C-alpha cells in the first residue's frame, strides 16, 4: 500500500490550527479616588461629644393678603388673595 495509513496526513495542517485562542485582556476596574474617613479621636470615647444643635430657621411672616410672601400664592401678584 502506497498511501499513508494514518488519515491525519490527508487533512491539511495549517499554522492557524495550532493557534491558541486569543483572550482579550481584562478591562481595568474604574479608578475611584481614595475616600478618607474622618479621623477618629485617638483615645476611643464610647460617647462622642454631641453635635451642635441648630435651631430651625424661623418661618417668614405670614401675610394673608396677596402681593406679599406667605399664603395665597405670595410674590408679586401671585395667588387669589381675598
From Swiss-Prot:
Keywords noted in UniProt: Sporulation
Chain residues in the propeptide: 1-19
Misc. remarks from the entry: Present in an increased level in yabG mutant spores.
Superkingdom: Bacteria
GO biological process, one term: sporulation resulting in formation of a cellular spore
Purpose of the protein: Inner spore coat protein which seems to play a role in germination.
Location in the cell: Spore coat
Biological classification of the source: Bacteria, Bacillati, Bacillota, Bacilli, Bacillales
Protein name: Spore coat protein T
Species whose genome carries this gene: Bacillus subtilis (strain 168)
Gene: cotT
Amino acid at each position: 500500500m502506497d498511501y499513508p495509513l494514518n488519515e491525519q496526513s490527508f487533512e491539511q495542517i495549517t499554522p492557524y490550527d495550532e493557534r491558541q485562542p486569543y483572550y482579550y485582556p481584562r478591562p481595568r476596574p474604574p479608578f475611584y479616588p481614595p475616600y478618607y474617613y474622618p479621623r477618629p479621636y485617638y483615645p476611643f470615647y464610647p460617647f462622642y461629644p454631641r453635635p451642635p444643635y441648630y435651631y430651625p430657621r424661623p418661618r417668614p411672616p405670614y401675610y394673608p393678603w396677596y402681593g406679599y410672601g406667605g399664603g395665597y400664592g405670595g410674590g408679586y401678584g401671585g395667588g387669589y388673595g381675598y
